[in-house]
Amino acid sequence: LRTPHDVLILMKMKKTLLMLWMAVCLIVSFTGCTSEEMDYNNPDVTLFVKQLKTGTYKMKNDKGVVEVPHFTEEDIPELLKYAEDLTIIPSFPSVYNMNNGKIRLGECMLWVIESIRQGTPPSLGCKMVLANAENYEAIYFLTDEEVLDAAACYRSWWEERQYPKTRWTIDPCYDEPLCGSGYRWW
């Protein structure tokens, strides 16, 4: 037979164990499943950017090469939101990327947009150079201010594309974001 004192102690122990169990469950729920998977064919721009900034992006193609997921024209407005972000990222996935110099997130987002626009990667890596550069040395890579200017060119290009092109408004730069800017892809 249990005394009232024993029953009280057992109730307190049960309460303490229940609270401890709840605390463990809360901790596991907040820290347990932190790795977010990217869907190659239906990628999330925000998750892509987050993983690029933390250096955790690892999406591989069929050949085992880390590459940019399959973004489409519908993703361009979201990609443009990061075009002015000059955050230096640890790496950028590109078969062609040599990671020469600092890798700016915004410049890489412009590279993704250009890849969507052309249907193929526009250059050896997510770097732009001055259009009249003598060679491909890093001294010709764009400055932060020039990258911001290039981002403005892409934003203007995207906004202009929303209007229909007619035969009366023939413009050689209609679908060329960097046309006349003095910049080109490396």
What would you call each of these model-derived segments?
Residues F30-G32:
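C-terminal motif of bacterial Sec signal peptides marking the signal peptidase cleavage site
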Residues L1-K12:
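Short, Lys/Arg-enriched N-terminal segments with co-localized hydrophobic residues
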Residues N99-W185:
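Compact alpha-helical subdomains of small soluble proteins
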